[in-house]
């Protein structure tokens, strides 16, 4: 049993959800917004789990002395990190599932209004966006020890910019513009709309298209950087050469 993973995927989302509901009550709302307070906390748990799990994997490789072996093996680091990141993303689904169960069983959230097809499509794109960002960030952790601190600090800024637990329109315009570079922002908007019962609209298809396009760009850039870094490491024989 891993208490670290349990804290990331269960305790942390529960704390964020509780804080959101307390603030909602302090604002004298009759009931908390379950889409942002409960489901949003599950999405935040997925993102946190991805960031810290991916960081921990690389640091463990450095500590155990296996990172150099992975880089020098016939299997590319890109493939190793792609599989690891996928497992972390799928594990993060536990946070979202737990939040969804809490919304249904504890808060009696009605399921009749949910647009199931739209929710499933948005969730798939959200997972793909998280995966593409995960393999992109994992490369930085290999190239430099110091980049691990940078990746750790991305947890809450990305959550703020992407509006995990509140609608994006309340943010300043400049923050909304920055959030456009994250694929999960576009998929999350459609997922939130699906839970609110909205039907398919041109905006939905645009959000899906943008999310998919940005995710593919992250994957292509990760592939290009991975090839460049592998070439440099094999020429110099040192990972510190980057």
State where each predicted segment sits.
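Hydrophobic transmembrane alpha-helices and immediately adjacent juxtamembrane helices
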Residues: 1-242
């Amino acid at each position: 049993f891993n208490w670290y993973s349990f804290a990331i995927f269960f305790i942390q989302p529960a704390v964020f959800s509780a804080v959101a509901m307390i603030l909602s009550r302090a604002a004298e709302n009759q009931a908390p917004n379950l889409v942002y307070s409960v489901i949003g906390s599950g999405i935040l748990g997925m993102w946190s789990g991805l960031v810290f799990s991916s960081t921990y994997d690389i640091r463990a490789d450095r500590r155990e002395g296996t990172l150099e072996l992975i880089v020098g093996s016939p299997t590319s680091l890109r493939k190793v990190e792609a599989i690891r990141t996928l497992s972390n993303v799928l594990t993060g689904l536990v946070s979202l599932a737990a939040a969804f169960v809490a919304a249904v069983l504890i808060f009696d959230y009605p399921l009749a209004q949910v647009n199931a097809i739209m929710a499933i499509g948005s969730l798939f794109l959200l997972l793909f966006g998280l995966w593409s960002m995960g393999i992109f960030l994992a490369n930085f952790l290999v190239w430099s020890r110091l980049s691990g601190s940078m990746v750790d600090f991305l947890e809450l800024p990305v959550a703020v910019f992407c509006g995990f637990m509140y609608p994006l329109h309340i943010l300043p315009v400049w923050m909304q513009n920055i959030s456009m570079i994250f694929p999960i922002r576009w998929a999350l908007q459609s997922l939130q709309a699906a839970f609110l019962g909205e039907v398919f609209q041109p905006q939905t298809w645009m959000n899906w298209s943008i999310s998919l396009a940005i995710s593919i760009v992250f994957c292509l850039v990760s592939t290009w950087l991975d090839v460049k870094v592998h070439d440099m490491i094999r020429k110099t024989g040192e990972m510190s050469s980057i």
